Amino acid sequence: MAARPRSHKISIPNLYCKLDKRTGKVYWQYKHPLSGRFHSLGTDENEAKQVATEANTIIAEQRTRQILSVNERLERMKGRRSDITVTEWLDKYISIQEDRLQHNELRPNSYRQKGKPIRLFREHCGMQHLKDITALDIAEIIDAVKAEGHNRMAQVVRMVLIDVFKEAQHAGHVPPGFNPAQATKQPRNRVNRQRLSLLEWQAIFESVSRRQPYLKCGMLLALVTGQRLGDICNLKFSDIWDDMLHITQEKTGSKLAIPLNLKCDALNITLREVISQCRDAVVSKYLVHYRHTTSQANRGDQVSANTLTTAFKKAKEKCGIKWEQGTAPTFHEQRSLSERLYREQGLDTQKLLGHKSRKMTDRYNDDRGKDWIIVDIKTA
């Protein structure tokens, strides 16, 4: 006589087994809880149990999502929106900013600037509901940044979080006018960095290493054109036509055409002569480029803004001038020096710098107490 089939204790819902009397084999089946249909799983008991467990999990998740979706629709029908957490809203906010970036409604630098404030907000308040955030929560984030000595970044954090809540108002996730970031105090940022004088610029220029000719080109372009660091690094020889250097400013989108005969009287050099110094035996698209292959770049490659900043800092340390800690001028200060030199020549520096307002240009003209004001004692 054939042996009696073993009994199977099945603890997994919707899993069944069936004995085939002809062959003596046990076949496993899974019954779909919604449709009632059976699905064959073969004769491997362990594999059948694993498949049934996974199927139950998937179906349970689907039913949970359906229930939540129905609840959300019911809440909307009642005129209420489900509460959204800070993390959930920040994910949507980032998506909105990416869309603005793709449609040229947001500058790349402005998009990158939002990164740290969003990260800090997520870390500090991520699990809270957006509508429950208070001015105290925002103030704690801002104060933590200020405590690290980054007052300018604290201003950026406040500015970005104000925009986060404005977008949330537009999306209907918080009531109109709800903006706890707006209620916080604007951090003060006292600028300690000194302006760069012409004598200091000349001392730094003379201390540039022979192995870094790109820094001399960058410094000359900065002083003669008055443009920002990123725009100088992006300058190409193909940007020159009609006897002018054409620049589309990365920060503002302003389009400038600077005549090559523009002359900086303080250096007794024209833009045309500076560009001639940028031309060499190395084939490159960029005015500021590597002339020698290094471990990080090949000959002719574009010099990055970070590389130019670091090289300027090293030349500044070698020039022999001592500044108090935290007050040494940066590469960007050449833009202010250029504005002051050209204003003395009588040029329209607002157009040269690409500013939309005279007020912004006047800020660059402020020497921050660097020079003495000579009192005119001549009588009429």
From Swiss-Prot:
Its EC number is 2.7.7.-, 3.1.-.-. GO terms for molecular function: DNA binding; hydrolase activity; integrase activity; transferase activity. Disulfide bonds: none annotated. Keywords: DNA integration, DNA recombination, DNA-binding, Hydrolase, Transferase, Viral genome integration, Virus entry into host cell. Coiled coil: none annotated. The active site is at R228, K251, H332, R335, H355, Y364. The keyword Hydrolase applies. Residues 191-377 form the Tyr recombinase domain. InterPro entries: CB, DNA_brk_join_enz, Integrase-like_cat_sf, Integrase_catalytic, Integrase_lambda-typ_DNA-bd_N, Integrase_recombinase_N, Tyrosine_recombinase_XerCD. SUPFAM superfamilies: DNA breaking-rejoining enzymes. Gene3D superfamilies: 1.10.150.130, Classic Zinc Finger, Intergrase catalytic core. Residues 84-169 form the Core-binding (CB) domain. Signal peptide: none annotated. It comes from the Viruses. Belongs to the 'phage' integrase family. This is Integrase. It comes from Enterobacteria phage P21 (Bacteriophage 21). The lineage of its organism: Viruses, Duplodnaviria, Heunggongvirae, Uroviricota, Caudoviricetes.
